[in-house]
Amino acid sequence: MPLADIVRPSTLDEICGQGHLFSKNSPLRRLIESEHLPSLVFFGPPGTGKTTAADIIAKRTNKQFFKINATTSSVAELRDALTASNTLSAFNGTLIYIDEIQYFNKKQQQALLEYLEDGRVTLISSTTENPYFVLYPAFLSRCACFEFKPLTPKEIVPAIQRGFLYLCKTYGEKETEEGLFESISATCGGDVRKALTVLENTYFASGQRLEIKVASQLSQKSTGYDSDGDGHYDLLSALQKSIRGSDPDGA
């Protein structure tokens, strides 16, 4: 099992960053702690806590829980989860988490509407895309949307420390070069999963001392560019405006 899954937070307070979502008096935190959780859409870059938050919410409820990945799951799996909401075992309701929901087509999204409307199913879905571009209006109108922001290096360091303690406890104590954790956190593009993967690889690729140069060789700094996402169109817009403004350096 990857280190990122082993040291995954088990409470909302352990989630890295996202204070706007999980601080004590935030709207989302209050919804989670209430008994009236609506269907939710989590959107944001990879490795920012969307799946972790869904898992924590699932453990807090007494609902029947299904987890589906839209990139690999079939229509039959979705149908089975929806059908289960009609059984006695789903007396307290059904919670379904759909990861990468942007890969569900309109027909699949529409199949969920009936169950969302009558309350048999509470849905948590996540996407790395802008939900207002990839999800259908009728589906979005029945959900509350929350954005997960890229993590800062400072917010990622505690997760790296937690991962390092686990590795040392499980496989043996090792030393680290000063500034190693900060170096890893600065080159992972706000993705805590990537940071923990780099840490894990660095640990096993090193002798008794983990060094920054080894971590750097095992990490490639993310530029955050996505040919299909918002960043692609933001970049094109910036290029167009630079050309329009006769700024060759800017272009």
Regions found by a protein language model. Name each.
Residues 21-26, 63-95, 106:
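Short glycine-rich substrate-engagement loop in P-loop NTPases that contacts/grips substrate
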Residues 182-187, 193-207, 213-217, 237-241:
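C-terminal helical "lid" of AAA+/P-loop NTPase domains
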Residues 69-71, 144-157:
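Conserved AAA+ ATPase "SRH/arginine-finger" region at the nucleotide-binding site
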Residues 32, 102-141:
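Conserved catalytic/switch belt of AAA+ P-loop NTPases
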Residues 142, 158-171, 201-202:
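Conserved AAA+ ATPase "sensor/coupling" helix adjacent to the nucleotide-binding pocket
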Residues 1, 27-69, 83-84, 113-118:
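Walker A/P-loop
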Residues 63, 136-151:
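A short helix-turn-beta junction within AAA+ P-loop NTPase domains corresponding to the substrate/partner-engaging
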Residues 213-250:
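C-terminal engagement/docking regions of AAA+ P-loop ATPases
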